[in-house]
């Protein structure tokens, strides 16, 4: 179920402050965040966020195509190593 239009997009307040500070100073540091639920805003374009995936911070460079999506969509939380190979086929 999507968010109501009248409510507007959700972004953590501290994340907006950090993004504005990074834009005004022109620094290209990674902005670490645990807020996977925050919506990507147009003023985030060009910034790099370190989005936490439960294990580490995954660097995500924001592009114009990402605006309106959530930060957590770009930092997968699950690792799938693949299915086990058939041992009989390996021997031959």
From Swiss-Prot:
Keywords: Ribonucleoprotein, Ribosomal protein, RNA-binding, rRNA-binding. The keyword Phosphoprotein does not apply. SUPFAM superfamilies: Ribosomal protein S19. It comes from the Bacteria. InterPro entries: Ribosomal_uS19, Ribosomal_uS19_bac-type, Ribosomal_uS19_CS, Ribosomal_uS19_SF. GO terms for molecular function: rRNA binding; structural constituent of ribosome. This is Small ribosomal subunit protein uS19. It comes from Phenylobacterium zucineum (strain HLK1). The gene is rpsS.
């Amino acid at each position: 179920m999507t968010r109501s239009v009248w409510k507007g997009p959700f972004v953590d307040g501290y994340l907006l402050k950090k993004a504005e500070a990074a834009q005004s100073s022109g620094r290209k540091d990674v902005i670490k965040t645990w807020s996977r639920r925050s919506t990507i805003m147009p003023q985030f374009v060009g910034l790099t966020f370190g989005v936490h995936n439960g294990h580490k911070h995954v660097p995500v460079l924001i592009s114009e195509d990402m605006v309106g999506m959530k930060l957590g969509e770009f930092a997968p939380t699950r690792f799938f190593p693949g299915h086990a190979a058939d041992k009989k086929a390996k021997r031959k």
